[in-house]
From Swiss-Prot:
ATP binds at residues 31-38. SUPFAM superfamilies: P-loop containing nucleoside triphosphate hydrolases. Disruption of this gene leads to an increase in hla (alpha-hemolysin) transcription and proteases production. CDD domains: AAA (cd00009). Disulfide bonds: none annotated. It holds the Pfam family CbbQ_C. It comes from Staphylococcus aureus (strain NCTC 8325 / PS 47). GO terms for molecular function: ATP binding; ATP hydrolysis activity. This is Uncharacterized protein SAOUHSC_01413. InterPro entries: ATPase_dyneun-rel_AAA (IPR011704), CbbQ/NirQ/NorQ/GpvN (IPR050764), CbbQ_C (IPR013615), ClpA/B (IPR001270), P-loop_NTPase (IPR027417). Belongs to the CbbQ/NirQ/NorQ/GpvN family. Signal peptide: none annotated.
Length: 263
């Protein structure tokens, strides 16, 4: 099945990402949570017909999660031997694929320097577990994503950031958002879609003012909401997809107020 492509009224977002990819530059997608950064990376992967290996960063990310690990395997002769299982970084390098590092600023700063040689002109790494020197084959590219100011994120190391070219990815809106809702959700009623878009605009404004978290205004939450509206009242759908995810009562009340204004 064909991938539902990333869309943005600002065509330079995708066009510049594609141009950087063609130049084999490391791309850092920077923007609010749920703005479509992963969708943009997936679309690039499909457009250039190159598979993508994904790393999801967290404070628990370690070198083994990136590069791979040793394990015991029984060979064809029935004997046990120690083998190395390639992780996403080494797989992408050996196969000439895309490496996508999601939420790179969630990782502990001391975990990522192992990638320095991968991200600069050398495009190579010495596997600390085997001693093997791996040089990336043609086609290998790196895309990373960052949610600045999100809970749990850390300032990105300058030496690491300098290895990337940055593209800002903001939320989509207007007719583009309307088309995305129709293509990627079950909701098709134009009047309801217009109401939802206006409601989402209010959430985005509140998010920028710090009244609610970014996730409440994300495209992911919006598409879930549109699906639920087709099977339940809009107020209950908003409660299930947005309000009940929030812990702060003030954030919840702010969204209840927006519901009263829009529906």
């Amino acid at each position: 099945m064909a991938l539902k492509h990333y869309k943005n009224s600002d065509s330079t977002v995708f066009n510049d990402a594609k141009a950087l990819f063609d130049l084999n530059k490391n791309i850092l997608l920077k923007g609010p949570t749920g703005s479509g950064k992963t969708k943009l990376a997936e679309t690039l992967s499909e457009v250039v017909d190159t598979p993508m290996h994904q790393v999801n960063c967290s404070v628990d990310l370690d070198t083994e999660s990136l590069l791979g690990f040793k394990t015991i395997k029984t060979n064809a002769e029935g004997q046990q031997e120690i083998v190395f299982v390639d992780g996403p970084v080494i797989k992408a390098m050996k196969e000439g694929h895309i490496l996508y590092i999601d939420e790179i600023n969630m990782a502990k700063p001391e975990t990522l320097p192992v990638l320095n040689g991968v991200l600069d002109y050398r495009r190579q790494i010495t596997n600390p577990y085997t001693g093997e020197v791996i040089k990336a084959v043609p086609g290998f590219n790196v895309i990373a994503a960052i949610n600045e100011g999100y809970v749990g994120t850390l300032p990105m190391n300058e030496a690491l950031k300098n290895r990337f070219v940055v593209i800002h990815v903001d939320y989509i809106d207007g007719d583009i958002l309307k088309n995305v809702i129709k293509e990627q959700s079950l909701l098709q009623d134009d009047k309801q879609i217009e109401q939802i878009i206006k409601f989402n605009e209010d959430l985005r404004t509140m998010s920028k003012q710090g009244q609610i978290s970014e996730e409440a205004a994300s495209i992911r939450a919006l598409l879930d909401l549109c699906d639920l509206i087709t099977v339940m009242p809009v107020e209950r759908a908003i409660k299930r997809t947005i309000i009940d995810k929030l812990e702060d009562e003030r954030e919840q009340q702010a969204i209840y107020n927006a519901v009263e204004l829009n529906f």
